[in-house]
Amino acid sequence: MKIVFMGTPDFSVPVLRRLIEDGYTIAAVVTQPDRPVGRKRVLTPPPVKVEAEKHQIPVLQPEKIRDEAELERLFSFEPDLIVTAAFGQILPNALLEYPKHGCINVHASLLPKYRGGAPIHQAIIDGEKETGITIMYMAEKLDAGDILTQVTVPIADDDHVGSLHNKLSEAGAALLAKTIPPLIKGELQSIPQDDQLATFAPNITREKEEIDWRKEGERIYNQIRGLHPWPVAYTLWNGKPMKIWWAEKVSSPKKEAPGTVIALEENGFLVATGDETALKVTDLQPAGKKRMLARDFLRGAGSQLSVGSVLGGQDGS
């Protein structure tokens, strides 16, 4: 049986690697084009391309998978099954209908919850205690195909996008390994999604990154870890954005205005929120500076920060 694998970021790599380890013939890998990365805009291949080339697997990098010429190239590999994991483009119907065993997708949520491009971020931001992996048939509508298998993955209180991403990626690879054999034998019964239960996790926008200190401390904490290590939550200090890489929840009976610095400690500073849960900022990045520990910030660039200083807007927003 020949498989074409379609994926792009780090999340996709363990999935591809597991297919290779399980002995499937990977006829080709389809991924996004190389993109400029970093301040120096260095042209960088997607992680999936790097992994595929280690195993001498042909790599296709179409700008638009819907282009007729790109589809013909893909059809030339005659896949019996197409597996996608965070590919980044919606597949056209002509491609969905081509493989004998269909096109299946590894999605990082328990569908129909969190359809879209940022399900890991959004689950943490929303304070979920669990999420999971769904393997489903693909449809032209985003993340709306019939469900084949699912597995639940708990979210710890100190999980962030990076740690949960790694858990889900490995869980996705393991679930796929269990799903393919009964799928190709015709032993799996798919289940349609209930669109009325669907929630959405669109890509993160700049507006979602700014901290509103008027919110409850728990919600801000979830926002910080739901944006770590990318794109990172931020607040304003002296009118300039300061990234908040990490913070800890601290019970505080003080009733200072949200955004007010209420204490300086050896390893961080406490900021008032909209309730009695303050946040101790321990890891940050001032505008124009490198990421640093809060204790180093307080000794240097942040020496002007004091009890009573206000982060964010004048009202903590």
From Swiss-Prot:
EC main group: transferase
Pfam families: Formyl_trans_C, Formyl_trans_N
EC code(s) of this entry: 2.1.2.9
Signal sequence residues: none
Gene Ontology CC annotation, any one: cytosol
Catalytic activity of the protein: L-methionyl-tRNA(fMet) + (6R)-10-formyltetrahydrofolate = N-formyl-L-methionyl-tRNA(fMet) + (6S)-5,6,7,8-tetrahydrofolate + H(+)
Keyword Lipid metabolism: no
Binding site for (6S)-5,6,7,8-tetrahydrofolate: 109-112
One Gene Ontology term of the molecular function aspect: methionyl-tRNA formyltransferase activity
Family of the protein in this entry: Belongs to the Fmt family.
NCBIfam families reported for this sequence: fmt
Protein name, as recorded: Methionyl-tRNA formyltransferase
Organism encoding this protein: Halalkalibacterium halodurans (strain ATCC BAA-125 / DSM 18197 / FERM 7344 / JCM 9153 / C-125) (Bacillus halodurans)
Organism ancestry: Bacteria, Bacillati, Bacillota, Bacilli, Bacillales
Gene from which the chain derives: fmt
